[in-house]
Amino acid sequence: MSEKENAYSFETLQIHAGQENPDPATDARAVPIYLTSSFVFKDAATAAGRFGLTEPGNIYSRLTNPTVSIFEERIAALEGGVGALGVATGSAAITIAVQNIATAGDHIVSSTNLYGGTLNLFEHTLSEQGLSTTFVNPADLDAVEAAIQDNTKLLYAETLGNPNSDVLDIEGWAAIAHKHNLPLVVDDTFSTPYLLRPIEHGADVVVASATKFIGGHGTAMGGVIIDAGKFDWAGNADKFPGVAKPNPSYHGVVFTEAAGEAAYITKARATLLRDQGATLSPFNAFILLQGLETLSLRVERHVENALKVVDFLNSHPQVERVNHPSLSTGRAKELYNEYYPNGAASIFTFEIKGTAETACKFTESLELFSLLANVADVKSLVIHPASTTHSQLTDKELEAAGISPTTIRLSIGTENIKDILADLEQGFDAVK
């Protein structure tokens, strides 16, 4: 990112970062879609230099692609990182972010308030590969620190926990991580960099499902990893040899020497993306770039509508409880006001009076809301987490995540608020 780009405001960066000037090959103002598998080297020395990480440039679209690179540069600028890696899905982003520094025999400390797929990844898939996880209540900082072991490689949490949008004390988690010379990895999907930039509060690595608010229209899958460039990998070389010592999978390169402050994200691209192939397609990157151009406008409307829905539900006689950070008390409310002064959390849950059958019937009765397993679309969405997104969790895990049989998750869209409220009301009428 140029110095000039760095001086721009968020709303300008979301449109221009990564492509300050027209396409140099065609003079196209819009970002071109480079649908090519590979790139021609002008000579053998250029080819060798690119493979040896001594000369920048494209090799193969599994690793880099001009369209994807613009998306990565734009996201890095918006999050305030030194570099980013676009991948096929949010799940791929989480997996690569963790496996980049943690392997068999290592340990993770993770928040319990996570997307069900992430919980399953940590509890089962990574566990089967020899990587263990201790889950802790994210609000209990003493428990977070107590869970750290000699083989712990990272702390992991979501800035707004899925599905209740519980607010993370990022600075508290970061202080604990850095006290023990560990990086803090956070999922910023529900917040977006427009509402919160975790790197400014101490996060070392940020991941997100770009499928959600970044794309914003439910049309393209994607994930992204952002490197803050601040963690001292070289100073902790024994703990993170893959980043800070000769890497045998890349002919002995030391990524902290070859890439400097971007060592972490360079290793992720050069090894894990190379080997696992969870590549973001240029077409999807183009769609996600289209979404980024209106991110701030959409998020403002999402939040505005959501807060009105929260007020509506909080006074509704058929609602047992609304789980939204604006209604929290004590330290939780302090964190919400501190990190989200303009509001947040258009994805949240409420508990309907009745049974699980009541909750499911309510989701089926809505007409404007779509019953589907996605969030952060311009369209309003609804789902019953206990039987869908979090159905693979045990009863104990559901309780720890704040999910009951009557919990309903809403993702509030950008439609007219009168229409949103009217649809919710007719849903309640259907289950009276």
Task: Identify the meaning behind each predicted range.
Residues 2-5, 18-22, 84-315:
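Conserved PLP-enzyme active-site core in the AAT-like
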